């Protein structure tokens, strides 16, 4: 995994705006309508090349395929990061009509019920709804996504070879987050988790074997806290989370840690988030995931202050932190100096070589496409400004030294 002691590298979390030509076919797929496979393949390949070109043109260092192989049914979609896996796993069928389990019971929704009624009526769209019939596992889980994954890898590697970028990454859902779906086959939660982990391991290994960085998306690690009713103790929740981390580590066995990064956030919907679990309460569990880098939400008003956690928590030697310094949670485009300040908060505590500037979450499907590119441009410019500051990390100190000289 690329890192630098000469400048602040930049990346993002994954989802980028899909072009209308791709969304048009995605809608047909979701509606069960006929579509031309060759046309879809051509549009997908072209779209991946274009999205890689745009990222490189703006100056993002570590880029991806925009998650274009993960089907969305519209320009706004909060669920494709995980729902894509339904098409790559066996052992499930559509369940009974009803509300998605992932939306039920959130304490934040209970506190702000009037707000959420309006939000649900206007903007919340998830591709995992399966036409109002949430899928349920009813048999042994297997991996059947080999062709779809091979297409994603081939499209991205071809596109990556045509642009100037430091590195490329591909996202995949972690078993803990996907296990929030319904299980009617496995006898225990743990058995269900490990079956998912074993199946998804095929995807993880293929991405690493393709010489790409694997990003594991696991917002469920902190985010499921809000779904637990009644509210558990922090210790109880950490035990619950550790089972998921252990299953993930099982899936990652033998894979090189320095080719894998792990992303958490507190859900990408535009809500109050007053019941989010503080990072301080889960950071020790986070650091038990056997990867080379940790991507965390840190660029919005609910979590921006949590850089201070790292004053007291040691990032393990050789690891990298990828804090979000621009956010999906607001249409306001961050000023590059604000971005630089956020980066420097982390760099002064952890050391600049241990920080890559990122985004809070995937930007595609959360904010308008024009704003996505404006925010990524601000990210790049902010990283340049932060690079000009000489940073001497003093672990445990809240006032490390800086100067205006650029580090050689």
Per-range role (PLM):
Residues 1-408:
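Domain-level signal for soluble alpha/beta catalytic cores
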């Amino acid at each position: 995994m690329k890192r630098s002691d000469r400048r602040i590298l930049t990346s993002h979390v994954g989802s980028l705006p899909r072009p209308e030509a791709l969304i048009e076919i995605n809608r047909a797929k979701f509606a069960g309508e006929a579509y031309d496979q060759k046309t879809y393949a051509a549009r997908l390949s072209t779209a991946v090349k274009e999205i890689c070109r745009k990222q490189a043109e703006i100056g993002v260092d570590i880029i991806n395929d925009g998650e274009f192989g993960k089907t969305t049914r519209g320009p706004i979609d909060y669920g494709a990061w995980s729902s894509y896996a339904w098409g790559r796993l066996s052992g499930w069928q559509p369940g009974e009509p009803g509300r998605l389990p992932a939306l039920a019971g959130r304490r934040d929704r209970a506190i702000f019920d009037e707000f959420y009624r309006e939000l649900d009526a206007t903007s919340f769209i998830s591709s995992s709804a399966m036409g109002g019939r949430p899928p349920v596992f009813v048999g042994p889980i297997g991996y059947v996504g080999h062709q779809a994954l091979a297409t994603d890898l081939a499209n991205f590697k071809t596109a990556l070879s045509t642009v100037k970028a430091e590195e490329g990454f591909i996202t995949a859902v972690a078993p803990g987050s996907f296990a929030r779906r319904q299980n009617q086959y496995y006898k225990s939660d743990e058995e269900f988790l490990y079956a998912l982990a074993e199946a998804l391991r095929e995807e993880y290994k293929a991405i690493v074997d393709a010489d790409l960085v694997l990003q594991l998306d696991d917002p469920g690690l902190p985010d499921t806290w809000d779904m637990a009713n009644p509210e558990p103790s922090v210790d109880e929740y950490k035990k619950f989370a550790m089972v998921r981390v252990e299953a993930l580590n099982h899936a990652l066995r033998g894979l090189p840690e320095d080719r894998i990064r792990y992303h958490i956030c507190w859900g990408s919907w535009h809500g109050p988030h007053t019941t989010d679990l503080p990072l301080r309460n889960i950071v020790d569990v986070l650091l038990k995931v056997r990867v080379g880098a940790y991507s965390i939400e840190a660029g919005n008003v609910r979590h921006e202050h949590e850089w201070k956690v790292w004053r007291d928590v040691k990032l393990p030697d050789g690891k990298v932190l990828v804090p979000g310094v621009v956010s999906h949670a607001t249409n306001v485009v961050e000023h590059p100096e604000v971005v630089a300040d956020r980066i420097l908060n982390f760099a002064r505590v952890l050391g600049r070589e241990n920080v890559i500037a990122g985004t809070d979450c995937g930007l595609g499907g959360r904010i308008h496409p024009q704003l996505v590119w404006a925010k990524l441009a601000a990210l790049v410019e902010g990283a340049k400004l932060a690079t000009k500051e000489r940073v001497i990390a003093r672990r445990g100190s809240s006032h490390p030294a800086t100067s205006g000289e650029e580090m050689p």
